Amino acid sequence: KGKSSSLIFSNYNFKSEDIIILRNELILEANKPTVIIDKKNQTLYEIDKLSYSIEDEVLKGEKIFINTKFNQPFSDKYFFKNAIFNLKDQSYIAKDIDINLKKDIFGNKKNDPRFKGISSSSKNGVTIIDKGIFTSCKKNDKCPPWSVQANKITYDKNKKQILYDNALIKVYDI
């Protein structure tokens, strides 16, 4: 009971309250907000409820916020309702997603590139978003000047390329 901090494999620093450790299963659980810092990948996780397999390095969680390269001026920010992460290979599957890419990803710091979708998966730098929307327009109180909706959006971070299946471009205020 109470506040606790755990360092696992010298890579993952867990900070939470009332952590439960299932020794035989090598599982760490927390039902209260938890912060995890992945030192190797410079990634910050904030999770409301989690289960972590120490042996497999698999993290399951609810109400998740992720900040990649959190110590740099520009970073990607992820918001998921539920997700499962393989921390070894940096892959995931998630539900109810909102991804804000770093502002200068496409060479313009004034943009706010972002995805929203029903679900998402990612492996080897390729992210697939189901029933998604993308825009890079600056955020404001109104809807963006344009967006692309698609049944499937494939974002290749390595190539900085976005592919759409069955897409619809929406342009506003013409």
Show where each model-derived region lies.
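Structural signature for solvent-exposed beta-strand/loop edge elements and short helix-capping sites
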Residues: 1-174
